[in-house]
Amino acid sequence: MSMTKRGILAGLIPACLAAAVLAGAGPAPQKQKTALFVWGGWAGHEPKKCVDIFAPWLESQGFKVEVSDTLEAYLDAAKLKSLDLIVQVWTQGTITPDEERNLEEAVKSGVGLAGWHGGLADSFRSNVEYEFMVGGQWVAHPGGIIDYDVDIVKPGDPIVKGLKRRFHMKSEQYYMQVDPGVEVLATTTFSGQYAPWIKGVVMPVVWKKHYGKGRVFYSSLGHVASDFDVPEARETVQRGMLWAAHVIE
């Protein structure tokens, strides 16, 4: 065999071996999704109990989950932007300018944000940019704990698809100021029994929206942890978190 042929073969062997290794490796493994739960604020909304419902569930879906009981979790801007999802469960209270800015910039950059009831839409009443991000703010719950119905209005959306078109709640019926630009998935109608001037008002209950590149999901259900014993209330939050994290479209 000539030296030229030997040189060609010598060059082909490692190339073929490399190709075989790459072919056997298969597709590169997908990066594990990451989520941060931040809970605290008013204890009456049972934030820890609610987190204990949804954090383990997200782990069962393959997420790496971190739980924090301080808003100081928002001080690490780089870490926030590395996440796939932030779930905030924090009613009332105050947030520092740095914490707020880092949270908002993370969502604008593409990190998902999800939450429910006062934990997301009655958090920081003096922070209008935060409210702009969420898409709404609680203002009243006439009658307190009452019986009311929730109607699915976009039954084809993946977050609510297959759920009962109307389901019952015994909880606070949130009256809210809502951004008209949100995409409403479920509503409730006020009877006027406790505030006659709002009789017949149709109020958004579940919505989704964007803030910059980030997806934002909200449900007004979930005054206390036992509210999530209602399958539809629990399922909408579960799917909403997945949507915000780009797991479902």
Question: What do these predicted ranges mean?
Answer:
Residues 28-37, 60-63, 78, 192-203, ...:
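Extracellular ligand-binding/catalytic regions of CAZymes and related secreted enzymes
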Residues 5-10:
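N-terminal export leaders
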Residues 18-32:
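Bacterial Sec-dependent signal peptides at the C-terminal "C-region" and cleavage site
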Residues 58-59, 82, 136-212:
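Catalytic beta-strand/loop cores that center a nucleophilic Ser/Cys/Thr
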Residues 112-114, 185, 217:
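Structural detector of well-ordered beta-strand residues that form the stable sheet scaffold
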Residues 43, 93, 120-121, 189-192, ...:
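Short, solvent-exposed loop/turn segments at secondary-structure junctions
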Residues 2, 37-38, 42-122:
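Helical hinge/lid and interdomain linker segments adjacent to catalytic or ligand-binding clefts
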Residues 93-162:
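A glycine-rich, often tryptophan-bearing local segment used as a flexible ligand/cofactor-contacting loop or short
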